[in-house]
Amino acid sequence: NPDELQMGGRRAQITTLFADVRGFTSFGEKYEPEQLVSILNRYLSVAANAVLEQEGTIDKFLGDAIMAWFNAPIPQQDHPLRAVKAALAMMHAIDTLHGELESEFHLSFGVGIHYGAAVLGLIGNKMRLDYTAIGDSVTTAKRIQENAAGGQILISNDIYQMISGQVKASPVEPIQAKGKSQPIRVY
């Protein structure tokens, strides 16, 4: 019953992952919508499976992108590492997918990962509700993803500090992200 649902949510510390299929808009100019949906679903399935294998929560699909988070609703001590493992699994699964697809359908993901506080809850109105994560940390993860090249995983300095002994990562030039007053250090 929509009248009984409470808007808003609860604050949580989460690791947010965004993965976007690079070049899909221009790719879309060449093919019929049915073919686009078929190809896009193959790529989004790869991303979704990688997130679920690491026990992440898929928030939503945003056109040619996926938004997911870790450490909620079930706490995970190793949530930053799980997000990075999911991103790496996406990249490996895409290599496999490319073996199944003609080269004209070879696309790649740009991935961004960040950690911080967010509110998880119902957003919208009684006619249309979404359960989602909202907060600066979520926006920052999105901005990091927007700066990742195809086939690239960018993690924030916060994530790097949490997993530095467990993964190999190199610093890249800090990014000046839209809406951010300070550059974001990424690896």
Mark where each language-model region is.
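Catalytic NTP-binding/metal-coordinating core of nucleotidyl cyclase/transferase enzymes
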Residues: 4-86
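Alpha-helical scaffold within the catalytic cores of cyclic-nucleotide enzymes
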Residues: 40-56, 72-111, 115, 136-146
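Intrinsically disordered or compositionally simple regulatory linkers and C-terminal tails
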Residues: 1-8, 184-187
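Catalytic strand-loop-helix junctions within cyclic-nucleotide turnover domains
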Residues: 69-79, 111-130, 150-152
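Cytosolic regulatory/linker segments at or just downstream of nucleotide-handling modules
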Residues: 118-120, 147-187
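A structural signal for short, well-ordered beta-strand segments
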Residues: 16, 66, 109-115, 186
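Acidic/histidine metal-binding catalytic segments
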Residues: 62-63, 102-112, 152-159
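Allosteric regulatory "coupling" segments in signal-transduction proteins
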Residues: 80, 128-134, 171-175
